[in-house]
Amino acid sequence: MWKWILTHCASAFPHLPGCCCCFLLLFLVSSFPVTCQALGQDMVSQEATNCSSSSSSFSSPSSAGRHVRSYNHLQGDVRWRRLFSFTKYFLTIEKNGKVSGTKNEDCPYSVLEITSVEIGVVAVKAINSNYYLAMNKKGKLYGSKEFNNDCKLKERIEENGYNTYASFNWQHNGRQMYVALNGKGAPRRGQKTRRKNTSAHFLPMTIQT
């Protein structure tokens, strides 16, 4: 390559003295690596840009999928269950609308239909008494013949695997009020309940048919 440069320099500038040709040659030689280096950097930069855009386009669908994925929790779902409390009672709604707990696992009033009415919001209805589980603004549990706002309960799965059911419409001093049965199977007032209270924890048990 250097032979070619010397030959062409000599033919292109025959009128220049030898020393000038030498200086010209040195100039060309010194500038050539810089040009190659700049060209190499441009190529590397271009490859990096292409790789970056390629990587971005490749990872985009998966990352988008994580955000787009739907978590419509049991919306429109209907389940038949018995709600077994952490205090060892089955929640019942009797034929007169009274809410209580029983140790009898075969009690017909403990058979409940749990229906999702909104995302994370359910209605609980006793099949044999035809009453809905309801909580009024004072935190009292009662059975309602008609579905109303008192019957909307927020269902949440807790860390221990049990569920909690809080009034969707009513709070007490900014705090949630929960469905709960005390150690004697009696319903607790919503004002005295907290999400961490085990008396408000229920295990939905599948009904064997």
From Swiss-Prot:
Glycosylation sites: N50, N197
Signal peptide stretch: 1-36
Protein name: Fibroblast growth factor 10
Native organism: Mus musculus (Mouse)
Free-text function comment from the UniProt entry: Plays an important role in the regulation of embryonic development, cell proliferation and cell differentiation. Required for normal branching morphogenesis. May play a role in wound healing.
Tissue note: Expressed abundantly in embryos and the lung, and at much lower levels in brain and heart.
SMART domains with a match to the protein in the record: FGF
Keywords assigned: Glycoprotein, Growth factor, Secreted, Signal
Gene3D superfamilies recorded: 2.80.10.50
Gene Ontology molecular functions: chemoattractant activity; growth factor activity; heparin binding; type 2 fibroblast growth factor receptor binding
Sequence similarity: Belongs to the heparin-binding growth factors family.
Keyword Ribonucleoprotein found: no
PANTHER family, per database record: FIBROBLAST GROWTH FACTOR
GO CC entries: cell surface; extracellular space; nucleus; plasma membrane
Stored SUPFAM superfamilies: Cytokine
